[in-house]
Amino acid sequence: MQTLAQHLTSKAVNESLAQLILTLADTSKAISHAVRHGALAGVLGATEQENVQGETQKKLDIITNDMLKDALKADGTVRGLASEEEDHVVEVSANGQYLVCFDPLDGSSNIDINSLVGTIFSVLPAPQGELTEASFLQSGRNQLAAGYVLYGPSTMLALTTGQGVQLFTLHPETNEFLLTNATMSISPDTSEFAINMSNQRFWEAPMQTYIADLLLGKIGPREKSFNMRWIAAMVGDVHRVLSRGGIFTYPTDNKDPKKPYKLRLMYEANPMAFLVEQAGGKASTGYETILDIQPTQIHQRVAVILGSANEVDACLSYHGIDSRK
């Protein structure tokens, strides 16, 4: 089996970009170690702090954020970073070539129940000149690399550099990421969907109707039965979609009119959309292709519908969108 370093060489990935990816991967190994120790290391539970989104930060949110910041500062290739846990962009190295956006611990509400969590990252080119928030406001099409690390029964890294999606598994003895799936591919059709049904009454009419038709199964207009899955961590739900197909959605809702969207564009939706498109799937807000969105702020939120291409098309048809044109 190829190691991650060997794979990056075989794909002729730019040397400095490969170095950055290896830094992210090495840091995820340390994060995996911290997650596994959990209560034994006293890292579970919440702090008394909130992040810029107004969410109470878990101890591991802060620990993993600091681990990634420290590693990226030492790497030398990074101009600046943006994190879910940082109010503002962070300047790293004046000579850096890349910008890194990340969610250090996606699904952190799962920590205290010992369920799935992960790290999501996106790499963008660093523009010339002074580093500001505007430096990061590039569409997802500009991403040079994206991926996530899933801390589950095995620690797994899903990665794209624009040459398909590869899956690596962390060997528990050698502590190396080894290539275990060279070509992740999302089947175009599916009978699985992932959504937080508790928000059903707050959705827009198109999503209400779409899900209602799925639940009708064989007796409904879709004429087949669907199963629902929900992990409550985007990284886990998207990993399932990449592994066996499906559709994942966190749609617009009016539960809190000031926050109609849940997921963040720069370090959740964009990297996941890049992975999904590279694996043959589609990713949309319901009205716009995610990777085509021009960001307006680093913590911008968007609706997300992604997964098996034909099922995403079916969902979009309820929104009056024909994505096959």
UniProtKB/Swiss-Prot annotation:
Similarity section: Belongs to the FBPase class 1 family.
Protein's organism: Shewanella oneidensis (strain ATCC 700550 / JCM 31522 / CIP 106686 / LMG 19005 / NCIMB 14063 / MR-1)
Catalytic activity: beta-D-fructose 1,6-bisphosphate + H2O = beta-D-fructose 6-phosphate + phosphate
Top-rank taxon, per record: Bacteria
Binding residue positions for substrate: D106, G107, S108, S109, N196, K262
Pathway the protein contributes to: Carbohydrate biosynthesis; gluconeogenesis
Transmembrane parts of this sequence: none
Cellular component per GO, a single term: cytosol
GO process terms (BP): fructose 1,6-bisphosphate metabolic process; fructose 6-phosphate metabolic process; fructose metabolic process; gluconeogenesis
Oligomeric form and interacting partners: Homotetramer.
Gene Ontology terms for molecular function: fructose 1,6-bisphosphate 1-phosphatase activity; magnesium ion binding
Protein residues bound to Mg(2+) 2: D103, D106, E268
Name of the protein in question: Fructose-1,6-bisphosphatase class 1
Key words of the record: Carbohydrate metabolism, Cytoplasm, Hydrolase, Magnesium, Metal-binding
One Pfam family linked to the record: FBPase
Cofactor remark from the record: Binds 2 magnesium ions per subunit.
Gene3D superfamilies in the record: 3.40.190.80, Fructose-1,6-Bisphosphatase, subunit A, domain 1
InterPro entries in UniProt: FBPase_C_dom, FBPase_class-1, FBPase_N, FBPtase
Requisite cofactors: Mg(2+)
